[in-house]
Amino acid sequence: IHKHGKQAYVFYDDSWVGMEPCGERFQSVGFDGLIKCVFSGFECRLCAYAKVPVHELRFHPYLFPVGLNGTPTFSEGGTPEKDAVRYWRSVRRALLRQPVERIGLGGYLHLTQNFPAFNDAIADIADEFRTIKQLHKNGAPYVLPIRVAVLHTWGKLRSWTLSGHFHETNKHALIHINEALAGLPVDVKFISFEDVKNGALKDVDVVINAGRMGDAWSGGKAWESEELVSELTRFVYEGGAFIGVGEPSATPGYDRLFRMAHVLGVDEDDGSRVCHGRWAFEVEHDLPITVEESSLGNLPHLYLTDGDTHVLCAKNGVPQMTVHDFGKGKGIYMSHFHVNPASTRMLLETLLYACNLPVNSAWLSDNALVETAYYPADRRLV
């Protein structure tokens, strides 16, 4: 392609296995750019993260008569301007953290002729995009001193993603966590279990492991490694934080289902504890974390492993969110995570608490419905 004076772009959606933008081989191919169609913030971070000269976002809604779910878009009854603004809100918070070079639309351009409100909405979005792009050009946004590592089997290879769009993978708590993290003022990277064994935790403050027992996101048999458990235990004991969501570190065949139960202060009963009692507890409300109960799950077989574990939320007498001091660090557990503005704020406050930082840290809004980004070079709060 280059031999004929053309450029080669990857459209990252239709066929990508073996050509993951975060893979070691991607750069060697020599692509000139990456195009990613986006509904969500995590997809923007995925695109911007790739090492190519040009990053382009393809916005929704596509210029088609109907949308993916069959509802009218650019046809009678459609309100594409509302769709565009709704998706832009998710995209914008991620772009404030990491920029791309271009934005665009796909489909049949003539369909927009009868939808002037859509054209006006896109003009406004384009103006906002140019402003954000210029802010990044002048200098990077302020980031809190919080370094987060999302831990799963794939590590860096599947940075920011699971396999597809949000609506295709939204049964997994991790995609909700990725979406929340996409717009937060924290440093985020993705590591594998082998990375942990090779010293990856030396540049990390918080590790997040979220998934169901046996899946690649929780880790499955990777947790049979005593070296892995020992390294994470040391990390927390010396001052780090381990946040587990769903069935983190879960694998059968040991005295506890969660291999990190001693750090988390909570475990899940697989039916083998019928003759054991339960620690009594009261829900505590004095920690600086605003719990969003509706975003948490309702796992029925959770129990405390330690009477010193603080329960922040319980349903039907079962703990669903807990905090456990372990050495100089903390183990924090959530039974699930469903992204919304309130739960995103809950995650941010959890990260702040895990790192012993105040919830009223600089350049943060005290309103869960308002997110901010501060650009020191311009002395501008967006």
Which role fits each region the language model picked out?
Residues I1-V236, G244-D255, R259-E268, H324, ...:
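Glycan-processing catalytic domains of CAZymes
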Residues D83, D215-V382:
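A conserved amphipathic helix/loop scaffold
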